[in-house]
Amino acid sequence: MGAKPEGIQEHLDTYYNSPVRDFSTTDEALRIRSVNGRSVLTYKGKKLDSVSKTRPEFETEVDGDSARSILIALGFFESGVVSKRRELFSYRNMTIALDSVEGLGEFIEVEEQADCNIEERCDEIFSFLEGLGIRKEDSIRTSYLEMVLEKKKEKN
């Protein structure tokens, strides 16, 4: 395939919900990701199309403990935690992540910066995946958090 290995990371993603609106119904996400001693606060807006998980994302490096304290003080509350091992590769202008998500299993995630034509970028990604034997129809738009919460609900 020719993909270049970029390393392995352990991610601990803690998601928060708003006291004013329910992110699960507005299709938004707010998380603090801890990776290798660094923490990043990320806000993800609503998905932009009906076939991919493309959405606006804004992130900034933070002190994890301070960011948690600020969110809690503002009334935000923890909505779930996702723990995963991520093996990263780069191929052309794509980032490929082989994820092993605790309690869920194995996944492949392919990203490309979509500063311009989203449809064109999606076509490139789906073409790449088809080369690996993964059909467009097999792709999922459900987030790891949604899957973790659904699995938790099924257990109760």
Residue ranges and their predicted role:
Residues 101-109:
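Residues forming anionic-ligand binding surfaces in small-molecule and nucleic-acid pockets
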Residues 1-93, 132-156:
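N-terminal strand-loop-strand beta-hairpin
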Residues 58, 110-112:
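A structural signal for short, well-ordered beta-strand segments
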Residues 47-50, 104, 116:
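Short, surface-exposed beta-strand-loop junctions and turns on beta-sheet-rich folds
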